[in-house]
């Protein structure tokens, strides 16, 4: 699907933001980190967040933490839940591996959202070839506040 979120297609952004089940890759347990602040805001707005973080020993924002995106997607699927959007807070050079991991799962989430400052052309091309909607270099919190 070819959505023009880059040039202010608010109807597309609004459509994407209707998906309330998110996996957040790189969600830090540290409240001073941007990923934590954005996730807390989204949770307050009614989104169901699934944290993906290397240390899964303690919940983040009251939610079970998964070490990998695949572990989260598989566990949620077994429980009859679907993650529709993967939100990424990782360095651009790490994004391709996250995209590849996501595509190894079934069902594949519908949207891959790279937060502000994050772009990866190779990951974008790979995901779009599989029908995934890709958003780059946009803050989900900011986009949500613009519309709601």
Spans of model-derived segments:
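ADP-ribose/adenylate-binding Rossmann-like module
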Residues: 103-127
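Short N-terminal or domain-adjacent regulatory/targeting segments
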Residues: 1-18
């Amino acid at each position: 699907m070819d959505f023009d979120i880059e040039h202010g297609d608010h109807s597309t952004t609004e459509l994407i933001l209707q998906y309330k089940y998110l996996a957040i890759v790189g969600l830090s347990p540290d409240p001073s980190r941007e990923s934590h602040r954005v996730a807390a805001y989204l949770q307050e707005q009614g989104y169901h967040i699934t944290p993906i973080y290397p240390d899964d020993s303690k919940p983040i924002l009251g939610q079970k933490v998964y070490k990998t995106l695949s572990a989260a997607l598989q566990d949620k699927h077994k429980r009859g839940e679907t993650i529709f959007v993967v939100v990424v807070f990782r360095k651009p050079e790490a994004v391709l591996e996250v995209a590849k991991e996501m595509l190894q799962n079934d069902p594949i989430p519908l949207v891959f959202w790279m937060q502000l400052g994050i772009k990866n052309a190779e990951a974008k091309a790979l995901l779009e070839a599989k029908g995934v909607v890709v958003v780059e270099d946009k803050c989900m919190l900011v986009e949500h506040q613009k519309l709601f």
